[in-house]
A protein has these predicted regions:
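Nucleotide/phosphate-binding catalytic cleft detector across ATP-hydrolyzing
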Residues: 1-95, 112-124
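A short acidic Gly-Thr/Ser loop motif
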Residues: 95-103, 108-110, 124-126
């Protein structure tokens, strides 16, 4: 939800080499921020993330990208999209994401039929 986050997204877009234009982006939130205590999407956090990412950025020497749409996903889940698409809804995949500042674990049903369990430790990560 920070200025640095917005600038990092626009920097990545500029470095991609595509011409500045309207774009749709997909971003993530740690499981502990994406889900509430009842394991339901925390719409306040999701909407806050969307609003942050959609803030305009101006460049001194050039045209900027315009974020047209933002989709917010729980961290780690997108890593399993391909495998989950090939599984039946009766199978499940355990996805473990050891990130810079969090450890996210999710048990997801095949075909993305549901997320049956999530765990996040916001104190475990690989950043020093």
């Amino acid at each position: 939800y920070s200025d640095v986050n917005v600038i990092a997204i626009h920097h990545a877009l500029v470095k991609s080499g595509i011409t500045p234009q309207e774009v749709d982006v997909v971003v993530t939130l740690p499981l502990s921020e994406y889900f509430d205590t009842n394991a339901q999407p925390d719409m306040a956090n999701i909407n806050r993330k969307k609003a942050n990412v959609m803030r305009p950025v101006e460049y001194q020497n050039g045209e900027a990208f315009t974020i047209r749409n933002v989709r917010v996903m729980p961290e780690s889940i997108p890593a399993g999209f391909k495998a989950l698409a090939d599984m039946s809804p009766f199978e499940s995949l355990l996805i473990v994401d050891l990130g810079g500042t969090t450890l996210d674990v999710a048990k997801v049903q095949g075909q993305l039929a549901g997320i049956s369990q999530v765990f996040c430790d916001p104190h475990v990560g690989v950043s020093l």
